[in-house]
Amino acid sequence: MKNKGKIIQILGPIVDVKFNENQLPKLLNALTIEFEKTKITLEVAQHIGNDVVRTIAMSSTEGLVRNLEVIDTEAPISVPVGKNVLSHMFNVIGENIDNQSIDPNTEKWSIHRKAPSYEEQTATSEILETGIKVIDLLVPYVKGGKIGLFGGAGVGKTVLVQELINNIAVHHGGLSVFAGVGERTREGNDLYYEMKASGVLDKTALVFGQMNEPPGARMRVALSGLTMAEYFRDELNQDVLLFIDNIFRFTQAGSEVSALLGRMPSAVGYQPTLATEMGQLQERITSTRKGSITSIQAVYVPADDLTDPAPATTFIHLDAQTVLDRNIASLGIYPAIDPLASASRMLSADIVGEEHYKIAREVQRILQKFKELQDIIAILGMDELSDEDKNIVYRARKIRNFLSQPFHVAEKFSGIKGTFVKLSDTLRSFRDILDGKYDDLDESAFLYVGTIEEAKQKHLKNYKGDHVEK
């Protein structure tokens, strides 16, 4: 016989349910309410005494009234897993939302799972080539690692995530899971049709809990997507790509739920359990002896402040931090990745090789020197610099421009054809710039090109155009 209770209080997305004595559902159990042809799922968050449980709703609670019947499913929220989920779109509780049915007998897994043990985990140092120059050169990504894309509003996080999906998913050919956490529904819709057009959708599962949904859904949707990825890793022995946009919204939803549950807020109003919740999610994203999950996570930075507790808590879990900078975006250089603030534990001579390491460090040295000279240039002008410093400034500007790149996913905005640049071409191009082989080229020729050959062609084209005009 099913364990049943009744609603006794509704406070927005928080619903209190009273059960019979000694029949309380376990913490994290899913409860269901059926009324007016709709089904609402709740998750048990607290036992508050007097046989009452406090729950978080996974969808809107509009229309609910007290004394409605609630049924304990006697299990946590479960989502479908396996090959049947590929090419489909789901919500937080695993319901198909793309109007295409999937096999009702598809296996389901609980979204709350333990992280792999130390014995099961494995370390890897295989580099993941992205085809994006600034990333491959200065912030190399590791296969099976966790990568964060940090940036404030409007600096290009989502476009960068979509380009990485295009480049890595198309070129690596494995399985991918995309979790849309608290972001714009329009972007999720665009992504679905772009994936369909590029032929990647057949190898991808999409899970969405967008910004119009209650905090419960936004807090759990990342776990739903991760569970699907874990199945591919553990049962099918696959190397999986997991894209999460945006991990900050996961934290934000947790903060909303925490306040509604009556917990005392901690620093800057965040939930006191911030580090625990982040750890429970991030520790499950790892490589095991069976397969790997490579995770690329967009992280919104409130007010461009990287010391804010939400991005700061995310930082410690990542293998590579790609920081997008508003000042670089304001120069019209995209991707607006800050080459000095971004870092990767893979940028070591033992992993990427001596040549790559030396080129990357020399590029960073020149850009750092350029940054130091900017105050002098602003006050005294270029004429007061030594010849050596002038040379550094000219090369740094070329390097800064050459770190830009036309994206495939931005073709419709920019009108410039996107490029995938091989690592060997990236290293060769930057080595030649550092050696002074292209000191005679105009710095504008380096903007939005793929390889150095394209920069030479652009320079010649500009040079001829100038002469024709004269």
Curated annotation (Swiss-Prot):
It catalyses: ATP + H2O + 4 H(+)(in) = ADP + phosphate + 5 H(+)(out). One of its GO terms (molecular function) is ATP binding. Its EC number is 7.1.2.2. Keywords: ATP synthesis, ATP-binding, Cell membrane, CF(1), Hydrogen ion transport, Ion transport, Membrane, Nucleotide-binding, Translocase, Transport. SMART domains: AAA. The keyword Metal-binding does not apply. It is a peripheral membrane protein. SUPFAM superfamilies: C-terminal domain of alpha and beta subunits of F1 ATP synthase, N-terminal domain of alpha and beta subunits of F1 ATP synthase, P-loop containing nucleoside triphosphate hydrolases. It is an enzyme of class 7 (translocase). PROSITE patterns: ATPASE_ALPHA_BETA (PS00152). InterPro entries: AAA+_ATPase (IPR003593), ATP-synt_VA_C (IPR055190), ATP_synth_F1_bsu (IPR005722), ATPase_a/bsu_AS (IPR020003), ATPase_alpha/beta_chains (IPR050053), ATPase_F1/V1/A1_a/bsu_N (IPR004100), ATPase_F1/V1/A1_a/bsu_N_sf (IPR036121), ATPase_F1/V1/A1_a/bsu_nucl-bd (IPR000194). Its main location: membrane. GO terms for cellular component: plasma membrane; proton-transporting ATP synthase complex. CDD domains: ATP-synt_F1_beta_C, ATP-synt_F1_beta_N, F1-ATPase_beta_CD. ATP binds at residues 151-158. It is found in: Cell membrane. Produces ATP from ADP in the presence of a proton gradient across the membrane. The catalytic sites are hosted primarily by the beta subunits. PANTHER family: ATP SYNTHASE, ATP SYNTHASE SUBUNIT BETA, MITOCHONDRIAL. F-type ATPases have 2 components, CF(1) - the catalytic core - and CF(0) - the membrane proton channel. CF(1) has five subunits: alpha(3), beta(3), gamma(1), delta(1), epsilon(1). CF(0) has three main subunits: a(1), b(2) and c(9-12). The alpha and beta chains form an alternating ring which encloses part of the gamma chain. CF(1) is attached to CF(0) by a central stalk formed by the gamma and epsilon chains, while a peripheral stalk is formed by the delta and b chains. Belongs to the ATPase alpha/beta chains family. This is ATP synthase subunit beta. It comes from Mycoplasma mobile (strain ATCC 43663 / 163K / NCTC 11711).
